[in-house]
Amino acid sequence: MSRQWDALVIGAGPAGLRAASVIAESGLEVVLVDEQAFPGGQIYRHVTAPGAEERFAEAADYRDGTELVRRFRRSGAEYLPETTVWFLEQDRILASRGEEVLDLRARNVIIAVGAMERPVPFRGWTLPGVMNAGAGDILLKTAGLLPETPVVLAGSGPLLYLVASHLIRKGHPLAAVLDQTPPSNMLKAAPHLPAGLLGLPLLLRGLSMLNDVRKSGTPVYRDVSGIEAQGADRLERVSFFCKGTVHTLDAATLLYHGG
């Protein structure tokens, strides 16, 4: 396959879908390339797949994601799902789709692959039952799978509380949230609050996630360090240091997010 477009977009998440839609609506020829079978990226993962509405923990995410995909499909942009780009040089892009190699040409390329959750090693991190928090959320969205209890979430950053909120809204109990964010980060962030108010909907969503955890009664340990996954053949316990004391919690699943 060899053809030239005005623009080629890599990544079918929110940014890639919007970019491809706007370009196509402007009358230009654009193709969107993505590794997944369905558009939506991570936040709207498989949002148009059968049964997605039941799997999504937040109705607003499902609504926003489906509308974004509908706009993209109405735009007339071309779409190459299950396609992996592995070479990019000037106006030439090589990609694989199944056993086929695609030779794609475009005058402009937009890379919208989003962020990638990084695995952070800690003691016991290779035990069965330990996984990235984002991976746990993907299993929920794509297959409706909930982690084995007791479930402990640990790490730092917004994704930690987003995953906690999703599990709580699905009625899935959490043993604890272990927040490793240093207290000093709150002071460092304070000067940016006025600018942050420009993104008020996102701030309100963050407060909603925190409120979900609070209302559920899930214990939250803050300024945590020294997290260790323990067990013989699989995860059995999580130990950590908090406020001068070593704590140990029974756990069958540890969802960790290190940024």
Model-predicted regions and their roles:
Residues 1-10, 64-150, 158, 170, ...:
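FAD-binding core/adjacent interface of flavoenzyme oxidoreductases
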Residues 5-63, 67, 71, 154, ...:
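Beta1-alpha1 glycine-rich phosphate/pyrophosphate-binding loop at the start
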Residues 18, 22-23, 35, 109, ...:
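Hydrophobic/aromatic ligand-binding patch that stacks against planar heteroaromatic rings
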Residues 35-38, 48, 84-85, 114-116, ...:
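Short, ordered loop/turn segments at secondary-structure junctions
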Residues 41, 133-134, 138, 161, ...:
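Residues on a specific face of well-ordered alpha-helices
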Residues 41, 90, 120-121, 141, ...:
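Generic domain-boundary/flexible-linker signal
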Residues 72-88, 93, 170-259:
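A Rossmann-like FAD-binding core segment of flavoenzymes
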